[in-house]
């Protein structure tokens, strides 16, 4: 599986998450996954909520259309974005 996969109108993102980073950014590839650095700590679901909010803003969809399919308790996550309005350039290069 590649880092970003199309499934009908949805996108599946394979992410490796680095919490408590100095800023939110897409770092690049980490093996077969996209490395996403986020400022939120991995406590009480704050990192997961931050990922959903960050990706919803980037892909211009409501937060409810971003869901973590796999990996809620770990750094390796599979995130579904339902019918994204746009695909940001920094993500599009990995399609």
Curated annotation (Swiss-Prot):
Q: Which InterPro entries match?
A: DUF167 (IPR003746), YggU-like_sf (IPR036591)
* GO cellular component labels: cytoplasm
Extract the SMART domains matched here.
Answer: DUF167
Tell me where on the tree of life, at the top rank, the source sits: Bacteria
Q: Which family does it belong to?
A: Belongs to the UPF0235 family.
* Protein name from the UniProt record: UPF0235 protein Sama_2480
């Amino acid at each position: 599986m590649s880092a970003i996969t199309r499934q009908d109108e949805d996108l599946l993102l394979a992410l490796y998450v680095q919490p408590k980073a100095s800023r939110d950014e897409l770092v690049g590839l980490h093996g077969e996954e996209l490395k996403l650095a986020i400022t939120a700590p991995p406590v009480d679901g704050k990192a997961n909520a931050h990922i959903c909010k960050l990706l919803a803003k980037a892909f211009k969809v409501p937060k409810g259309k971003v869901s973590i399919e796999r990996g809620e308790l770990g750094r390796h996550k599979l995130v579904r974005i339902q019918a994204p309005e746009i695909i940001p350039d920094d993500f599009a290069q990995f399609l």
